[in-house]
UniProtKB/Swiss-Prot annotation:
UniProt xrefs under SUPFAM superfamilies: Triosephosphate isomerase (TIM) (SSF51351)
Residues bound to substrate: N10, W11, K12, G170, S209, G230, G231
Protein name (record): Triosephosphate isomerase
Gene3D superfamilies in UniProt: Aldolase class I
Gene Ontology molecular function: triose-phosphate isomerase activity
Principal place of residence: cytoplasm
Gene Ontology CC terms: cytosol
Record family assignment: Belongs to the triosephosphate isomerase family.
Substrates-to-products reaction catalysed: D-glyceraldehyde 3-phosphate = dihydroxyacetone phosphate
Keywords, alphabetical: Cytoplasm, Gluconeogenesis, Glycolysis, Isomerase
Native source species: Alcanivorax borkumensis (strain ATCC 700651 / DSM 11573 / NCIMB 13689 / SK2)
Amino acid sequence: MNRTPLVAGNWKMNGRKDLLTEMADALAGYAGAAEVVICPPFPYLAAARSAMPGAVGIGSQNVSEQEDGAFTGEVSAPMLAEVGCGYVIIGHSERRALYGETDAQIASKFAHAQAAGLVPILCVGETLEERDSGNTDTIVCGQLRAVVDAVGVAAFANAIVAYEPVWAIGTGKTASPEQAQAVHACLRQFLAKDDPDIAQSLRLLYGGSVKADNAALLFAQSDIDGGLIGGASLTADSFIAICQAAE
């Protein structure tokens, strides 16, 4: 099955308005086949939607598991949709590790995002200790299963899953193309047990120190449909090169 490649730039807590302008100018000249999404920090979401070409999607890096109410500092899915977001990253390893997000919370965020019309980008991944102990497949499929059990497999007809090995996030280490492909294939096969058609159509992204010089080999793998890009998404030239590698 042909799946449209997607490259999402996760700026994390980086960037200023001048980066929005620089990136918008660069993406205005991009006419490739890959779908492109930019995920800046909360304060820049509306400005990003105004600045970016219409074909570029805007995503949030997080969302509340609550609809509304007395939750100081939280941002709801309907609010994100109202300012022009079409996507939201859910369950990033930094959210799990630094803020203690649980599988149950992540599943709730996933459901709230979809209810507001947002496309969740669900992140799964293992630590180096878990990989070294041979538990990679158990961990990542368990993280996926927690959400499938909560929302149903049909929800993944309009979702994206990103495999981000925790040991490769911001470390300069990258899973080899073969290592990444093996996990992506495992995730697709795992979901196929519930629904083969959804499993085949689901886009699986790789995230973990993807750069312009290693993107093409990663994206050439049969079950890798693009990338969730961190540091390399903060420079227009490198991000465009990665988008081109995904075509």
